[in-house]
Amino acid sequence: MMTTRRHILCVWLFINSSIFIKRAAAFSTAAKQQAVIPPGILGPPEPLKSLQVGQTLNAFRLVVDDDDDRVDFSIERVANSPHIFLLRNFLTSSECNQIQALAEEGGMKTAETVTKGDTSSRKNCSVAWIPSSGPDGSSLVSGLVASTVNIFLSDVVKSRPSAGVENMQILKYGVGGEFVHHQDGDARVFTVIYYINGVGGTWFPLADRNDGEIPKNKAGVLELVENLEPGKHGIFLKGDSSNSAQEGNNNKHTVLVNKGDAVAFYNYRDEGSAQLDWAALHCGSPTDETKWIANHWYRLNELANY
């Protein structure tokens, strides 16, 4: 019964999410006006909120410019703190190839972080940006935004004037490429990482940590994770096609991902403090093969005031 209800919900909201996408084209200046962030809106809405680790919901999204009218996928909770969900088969193989082609056609540059000129935090990596909406955007990309917004953002967040989505970031990592530990933050309330060629390596070292408190600042968490290891601590999303994919997979800390899968997670605490959730600290581990991923960041700009 839950599955049927989810299907109906996805279709209706997909059609009505265009309001969010249009607003995303230019973030509202209303973000500068501090507003109260009540508890229970920065995390997952129902029925995702009640999903237990290991439990799965079936869903679908509508497809634009494709012979098929929908893509069926599943949503599995893989961690409670932070809220992390794995979307199995969210993208078709054809859509993955299309995203990769969009990046190559548009030209790729050496990737930087939010700090202009910083190429040391992200190594051996090229980047391209694809508009998430507007006349220069891709119908595939805007469709992914619509589907994701519908499922993962609360009605309150979607209705806020300062809500929006950044352009899709497409990344190509060469052998040895990596991205050091970081928290997406900066008013990015929610993140989706798409696995374009099935090479994973996303590690959340503090996910579902039950061994002491997590510090509430960057310096503290970076010191804490120094002695932790992927596959032994936190949650490690590992490419099923990786050369080392068969090593150390039979434990609760490792989740295998394939081409077309995506991981979705929340970056802020949801108890009313509107503070960063440092359990969402993550990194892109050094890769032993070429790795293609794409990112979408969903913003609530008023969070910058807290």
Regions found by a protein language model. Give the residues of each.
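Classical eukaryotic N-terminal signal peptides for Sec-dependent ER targeting/secretion
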Residues: 1-10
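Fe(II)/2-oxoglutarate oxygenase catalytic core
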Residues: 9, 14-16, 20-23, 27-306
